[in-house]
């Protein structure tokens, strides 16, 4: 199975392996995190080992490749071939037991000089909408009905259960975001009072999902040039990629450069080299990265979906506040501001139900803002070869490669929340 450069150009991806997804029969690519720039797991022959590696062998321009596949700029790839059968992999020995992926980089044509600039911009969004979730009114009426049913199942009469529920429902959920008193919020049938309204201060502060996500923006710039004749061919490329992820703290940046050269000084002698350098930096959203990257919020999307739609993101006054002379200082629902006049996050210790232990003392946006996880990598890859032809049908080939990598991983966990 072969994927050529035209197919690669049609798909705006940060890793050449992502191009293989759906293009090669029998090949599986697994990216369970969704972080921009992450190297997807590739399975050609399924899972052959429980504890050992199931990763295929990558071969770039004839040499086994041990670096990150995300170091390779897809714009520099001429073709990708996948070898599945044992006979095709015999050349590489036991390293090829999980299959082989052959990657061929672009080289200059034999005639002419050219310079090409490719600029691409794109946006990414969630492909499938989320399930509809309860709004605040639906949630409150459902909680009222559930608590009343619980009281009846414990022996209370329907009338007693209704009275007790109306009196105690706010203490059960932890907060009253409406313009009605706690015991006047519902009628006898469990419906919100006809004149019950969410206070203005809370209206725009109950959405946890939208502030955490965004439409991703992708910018890619590639400059390449080449010159060639019958004896010498040289190609260079420079690339820059900036990709913002679906969550606001996730992004991937890559600066890459490559040089490919082939020389034929004599009819019987051919030599060449390829050099590639990459600097990349990845910012992870700790809450979305999963337990492999963080022990803070293990699943931010679950938190955003699970938290009840009555709990605000920021701190609010839960009662009217009056000055000593009786004048109104703050209305119920107003934001509680800090000394600089900014909004303060609410960790739920005072506003959420005591039974909701999973969210109390936690805050998706606050933790995402304070905690940091990022890594930076510098890579240099080089291949060189010499082919000497002698007699009529013999060629002596000598190949060598070099791989240098420097990686810096950094993580910061705050002491305020979480």
Report each predicted region and the residues it spans.
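Acidic/polar loop-and-plug regions of large Gram-negative outer-membrane beta-barrel proteins
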Residues: 278, 284-377
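Short, small/polar-rich motifs associated with maturation and membrane association
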Residues: 1-258, 263-272, 276-278, 290-294, ...
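Intrinsic-disorder/low-complexity, polar/charged segments
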Residues: 15, 135-136, 363, 407, ...
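A short, polar/proline- and glycine-enriched secondary-structure boundary/capping micro-motif
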Residues: 127-129, 283, 365, 408
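Proteins with a high burden of low-complexity, intrinsically disordered sequence enriched in S/T/G/P/A and R
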Residues: 1-3, 80, 103, 344-355, ...
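Proline-centered flexible-loop/turn and helix-kink motifs
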Residues: 25, 305-309, 392
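Tryptophan-centered motif/residue detector
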Residues: 206-208, 366, 412
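Small-side-chain secondary-structure face that scaffolds active or pore-lining regions
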Residues: 191, 246-256, 262, 276-291, ...
